[in-house]
């Protein structure tokens, strides 16, 4: 298991190494059970929000490369920064692979499949169509099995026009990419799987199997933040604070927001004293984007 062992050695986290080893084995066993190399199969890879799903995806890719799979697509949402971030992380994690970005079509055609190849693409109609044509036309792809890992698989991938008897652009292109290979395993990766589970059997998007990623030690998720009794770190503000902001000019900062910013600055100072640098503060005031402009810095 050269590829998986090399990937694990770069994680520098014993509990994550154990988790990735176990999860990738479970995914491998499910593929062996549900995939017959004649018809495509769909798997749901379900993990908690911000619980290390990317690390698990890369571990699964490494394990499948060890048994001879050669072509992997890793799909991100249609966001330039996210695609680049995923590409750079994959490149630094899978050093034994040929990791390609969206514009590396010439490199792909020149280098072929001497190494296992991961292509990191945005879910963008133009980009997906371009790579579908490349996969269809290249000689060394013929007869190869394709593995697709769709990060946030419930975002943009499904057919949003099904009730109008039409095909949405992204969904149509993804179907075409799946059909370009002799057969395909498609992994829908998400923390919010409801829409995927509700897909019809005939759609081709209903999962044949499900794998759940357990979060590692120290993970703080819904069980912590929505616990009863309320955890110490949760503070409730007045329910009408947003009304106060929208009624005043852009310089008005309500009491709850002021306190939140002060807590954040204290935490930043604490982390700096410990030699840590990464601090983020997020405000989600409304589902309406025009309200967000009042909070933008």
Predicted regions and their residues:
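Motif I (Walker A/P-loop) of helicase-class P-loop NTPases
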Residues: 53-62
């Amino acid at each position: 298991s050269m590829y998986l062992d090399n990937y694990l050695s770069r994680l520098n986290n014993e509990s994550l190494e154990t988790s990735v080893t176990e999860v990738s084995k479970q995914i491998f066993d499910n593929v062996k059970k549900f995939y017959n190399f004649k018809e495509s199969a769909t798997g749901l890879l379900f993990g908690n929000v911000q619980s290390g799903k990317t690390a698990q995806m890369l571990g699964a890719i490494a394990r499948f490369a060890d048994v001879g799979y050669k072509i992997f697509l890793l799909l991100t949402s249609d966001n330039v920064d996210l695609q680049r971030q995923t590409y750079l992380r994959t490149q630094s994690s899978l050093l034994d692979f040929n990791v390609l970005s969206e514009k590396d079509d010439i490199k792909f055609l020149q280098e072929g499949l001497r190494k296992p190849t991961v292509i990191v693409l945005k879910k963008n109609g133009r980009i997906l169509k371009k790579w579908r044509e490349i996969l269809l036309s290249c000689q060394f792809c013929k007869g190869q099995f394709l593995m697709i890992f769709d990060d946030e698989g419930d975002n943009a991938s499904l057919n949003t026009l099904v009730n109008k008897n039409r095909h949405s652009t992204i969904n149509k292109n993804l179907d075409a990419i799946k059909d370009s290979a002799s057969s395909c395993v498609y992994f829908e990766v998400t923390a919010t799987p409801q829409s995927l589970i509700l897909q019809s059997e005939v759609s081709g998007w209903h999962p044949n199997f499900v794998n759940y990623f357990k979060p590692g030690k120290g993970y703080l998720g819904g069980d912590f933040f929505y616990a009863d009794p309320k955890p110490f770190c949760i503070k409730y503000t007045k329910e009408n604070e947003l009304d106060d902001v929208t009624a005043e000019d852009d310089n008005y900062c309500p009491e709850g927001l002021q306190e939140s910013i002060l807590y954040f600055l204290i935490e930043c100072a604490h982390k700096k004293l410990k030699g840590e640098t990464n601090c983020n503060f997020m405000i989600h005031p409304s589902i309406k984007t025009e309200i967000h402009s009042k909070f933008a810095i």
